Design a protein with these regions (language model features):
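Non-catalytic, conformational "gating/processing" segments within enzyme and secreted inhibitor domains
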Residues: 81, 121-283, 287, 307-395
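Extended, hydrophobic/aromatic-rich amphipathic alpha-helical segments that build helical scaffolds
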Residues: 88-102, 214, 411-416, 421
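Extended hydrophobic
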Residues: 216, 268-284, 396-429
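Non-catalytic interaction/Regulatory regions outside core domains
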Residues: 30-44, 359-360, 368, 377-381, ...
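Extracytoplasmic/secreted cell-surface and envelope-processing proteins
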Residues: 95, 106-110, 290-293, 323-325, ...
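Detector for small/aliphatic-rich hydrophobic stretches
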Residues: 7, 19-178
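Internal alpha/beta scaffold segment
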Residues: 286-308
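Sec-dependent bacterial lipoprotein signal peptides
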Residues: 1-17
Length: 429
């Protein structure tokens, strides 16, 4: 069961789907427009690139492709009227911790699902040690944090081996007392709220604690200001056409400046940099009359990586979105029908069961909650991914390009030196 909420406070609008909109509409007060900056001399000079080995670059590229495939599954599974927001980075970190709880065929199938055949858990751990350190240092003007935790039933202590592996992810370990389900749920949710600066306040309900054996949780938080800030005086009330064709009036931000842009057959991709340029906000905008589903189907991750500057007239709605998806385990099985998470095997590998018996057939689920707010100042975003194990104990560069987001589109946040996606979203309603 998936839950989605669109927060109307900022009249948000970011999605992916096919709608029509008014063509060639440009409402620009040239007098108020800021001067177009030349990005060549001052763009990204303070960003700190993340240095990956050749093997880590290969892992990174493979994970990017895997992430886009998961997003496509998520989009295909959405209900009409839904907006989608996914954090590939949060999911992949959680799966990295999860992989350390596996061996044999179970591990091999997970790595295959993640597009990482030929790599080991050790390779994945080394990659994430580099990424988790590097991404926090990429831009000192951007607030970014990633935190991990491991929660386990008081009857089952993790083995020294597994506890040592989790140190690769700086995971904090906590004991769950199922006799105090309300307190345990409160502790987990307080941890989530603290690590996301209050943007996501819960990931688990009290009723889920009773049969919870363990939980692996990743939480990330991001806040960055635009390199080219939108002037609040340029924001106007303007029409947005939803995926169903309904016209809605929305607060729409406007700016004309030099941005990275690439036009493709049926859609365009633009990047809006944050602060020192280590991170970009990217948008995939279908041409008027082009169905967004067809764009998503043919979209490859390489299409998001653009390198040429153009003068672009951006019109983007302000928005605030929350999303919850409980079907991530299903999406993984769609990517690899052979994947079978043997909960008993994973449990036996990583816990000292001396003196205790438990019901077999652990049930696993993967839940992700996300949040994003976009306004004239910048972007604030958060994500939490929880892996839960339940059981019973016992173009011409001089041309101005119109890029008007007045119909459904894709969007996200990307780290530039490694092209790692932190968030990918669809806005259409």
């Amino acid at each position: 069961m998936k839950t989605k909420t669109l927060l109307i406070g900022c009249m948000a609008a970011l999605c992916m789907s096919a709608c029509t909109s008014n063509d060639n509409r440009r409402v620009i007060d040239v007098v108020q427009e800021p001067e177009i900056e030349d990005p060549v001399d001052n763009f990204r000079h303070e960003a700190q690139p993340i240095a990956l080995t050749r093997s880590q670059e290969d892992i990174n590229t493979r994970l990017q492709d895997f992430s886009l495939q998961v997003f496509k599954q998520m989009y295909a599974d959405k209900q009409a009227g839904d907006n989608v927001l996914f954090s590939p980075f949060s999911l992949n970190v959680a799966l990295g911790m999860f992989a350390n709880a596996m061996e044999g065929n179970t591990l091999a199938e997970l790595l295959k699902t993640m597009n990482l055949e030929g790599f080991t858990v050790g390779d994945l751990n080394d990659y994430y040690q580099t990424m988790l350190k590097g991404i926090k240092e990429a831009d000192d003007q951007v607030a970014f944090s990633s935190a991990n935790s491991f929660w386990y039933h008081q009857w089952f202590s993790p083995t020294e081996s597994y506890a040592e592996k989790l140190k690769n992810y700086d995971a904090e370990a906590y004991v769950i007392n199922p006799a105090s389900a309300a307190e345990a749920a409160k502790d987990i949710n307080n941890w989530v709220s603290d690590k996301t600066n209050g943007k996501i306040t819960s990931i688990i309900e009290e009723k889920q604690i009773d049969e919870l054996i363990w939980a692996l949780i990743n939480a990330i938080y991001y806040k960055g200001g635009w390199k080219h800030e939108f002037a609040e005086g340029m924001t106007i009330n303007q029409q947005f056409t939803t995926e169903s064709g309904e016209a809605k009036q929305m607060d729409t931000m406007r700016i004309t400046s030099k941005f990275l842009y690439q036009g493709y057959d049926g859609y365009g991709v633009a990047h809006l940099p944050y602060n020192d340029g280590a991170f970009d906000f990217f948008v995939v905008l279908p041409d008027n009359g082009t169905d967004i589903t067809s764009v998503i189907e043919k979209l490859s991750y390489k299409d998001l990586l653009v390198s040429d500057y153009y003068t672009v007239n951006i019109e983007m709605p302000k928005f605030e979105v929350e999303y919850k998806d409980e079907q991530l385990l299903y999406y993984l099985s769609q990517l690899n029908p052979n994947i079978t998470f043997n909960g008993d095997e994973i449990h036996m590998l990583n816990f000292d069961l001396t003196g205790h018996e438990f019901e077999a057939n652990l049930a696993l689920e993967i839940i992700q909650k996300t949040y994003m707010k976009v306004d004239e100042k910048g972007t604030e975003a958060a994500a939490v991914t929880a892996i839960l194990a339940h059981g019973a104990p016992g173009i011409d560069t001089q041309t101005i390009i119109d890029f008007h987001m007045d119909h459904p589109f894709l969007y996200g946040i990307i780290e530039n030196s490694t092209n790692t996606p932190l968030f990918i979203g669809y806005y259409g309603n």
